[in-house]
């Protein structure tokens, strides 16, 4: 399928991909006869590059007087491709040394001398760059269009969606009754008394349904059970794939609650974004067992610095990339999750079984209390750490007693660190704890976990910690779709906000989530409940995530054409900051603020890629394309935040995207999208990291802290 845009008209030629080269050559002949002639008159690729460079430079000189910014940007883009052609780059995520031959391939293609198998996707991308050079198009975001695109996506609070899910719940309850009847687990609290009627069993399951422990106990753990609970609606192809996954040892874990969010009816809502989170792809199953850690700093070796230069305690409890923040993964049920996300960034840890769903084995041992005290000393004795992110797995998977102990240990550590600073002079004082975060997807996966007792623990900790200088308390959650925002999720969100914590959302920008208007609708839906958005993450690019991978160009397109209608005016940001920190009920306050300022939502999130060992950034240039048409991006780190000094020792950072733009558009077409709505995607070949919203900045200290870094070895 060749995807060519010409004068805003989409021409789709239905041919097999491998046979499209000749047809694509005819398109070049018709559209760019000058380029074909230039190639044919060049003896080799070097002469072609020299001639093309001279032509582009001459064109640039002519255009400088006209201030034609779009065309000039494209011209510089093509010059970058020429500059990097016939070079090698070290790809950061894989460590491979890769040749860059973009313009050489173009010359071979135009002269009929392709030496290697090269995908048409490469030449489709280049076609659009030359088309933009000749016909630059100024992108004008359309608010009315974005509103229409947002209206496509229902939420879990819509009456029609709730009605379908009530029917799902009835079906699943019937399945649960059969499951409990077949179980032989005398120790389980979820069993039926002898001789009770079906109606009594049904009433008991309805009662249990409202407790998180029931859903975890009854989680679906096999493909056949999954199909049973989904009314035998899975295809033979899907069942075969899931059977292969099980044979390879991939864990399955889906709660009845989350399963009730799927739609197995022929009518009703599109559940692809939710479904793709629990259904595995061929690529994921193929690579499971050989998946590598994308987060290179997560690979910890005793007495050796990690990839970011930080020395860490032995084991896998503390992960660190930046000077100010470290992640704590407790030895508890927090190493499990409420479900296994198919695009999980820690799939490597599930593969190694450091993260798993064996709840009994994950319960804290007596030695954990001692270990926790030792881990807290790391935070206490570090000169720069002022932010702790407790995650996993999932922080809220820890039992209440365990979570209370962890938070108490954090509190005592913060007290000691503050006390120690009293004897340190100005300029030598250590960073004190200012921010505590709990990373959890349970607000989407299993909001029933948010009980009165849990809320009480959060409220009590905030009150105590606020008195010793901790001022930021965040639940860092992960809603992927507005369909996950259910009445149960709303109740959980309201309870946590009432306890004084802020809830921030991180989205993974999968293919289904990247559809026009989808992310904008999610922001709007969350804002209405008082949740503020934090990051929109590009999917990390190893092969296991090929099926869900969205190119960074689409993320940039979303930010500049959709998220722009949630851009908070600079003069209003202080008001929004105060509202998020202090005003309740936050949802109603946010809705009023958005309406008063003509915003569709609050676009407080940053669209970024998490780079191995370096951190979050969207500052890059496209310097080439692989033979498969995948873009080769040259990244720079986010200059707006502090990094490990190792950043100064690292060379240039190159990342190869997981999928070509053309392949992504074909995938969108296969799931029913009108790809004409995405036609400006080819314009986005370079990015710049967005500024951070003020609520995500650390507050200033009332003293001068040291610049010295401890626990660092370069």
Positions of predicted regions on the chain:
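Radical SAM enzyme [4Fe-4S]-AdoMet core and its adjacent flexible, acidic
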Residues: 15-40, 56-60, 64, 91, ...
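N-terminal pre-triad scaffold of radical SAM enzymes
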Residues: 254, 310-349
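Glycine-rich, often proline-containing surface loops adjacent to acidic residues and nearby aromatics
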Residues: 322-326, 340, 382-391, 434-439
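Conserved AdoMet/S-adenosylmethionine-binding subsite of the radical SAM
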Residues: 373-380, 396-568
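Conserved alpha-helical substructure of the radical SAM core
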Residues: 336, 347-388, 401, 405-408, ...
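Catalytic or ion-translocation cores adjacent to nucleophile or general acid/base/metal-coordination motifs
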Residues: 320, 331-335, 349-360, 439-440, ...
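Flexible, acidic/Gly-rich N-terminal and inter-domain linker regions that tether
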Residues: 4-321
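C-terminal accessory regions of radical SAM enzymes
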Residues: 254, 559-714
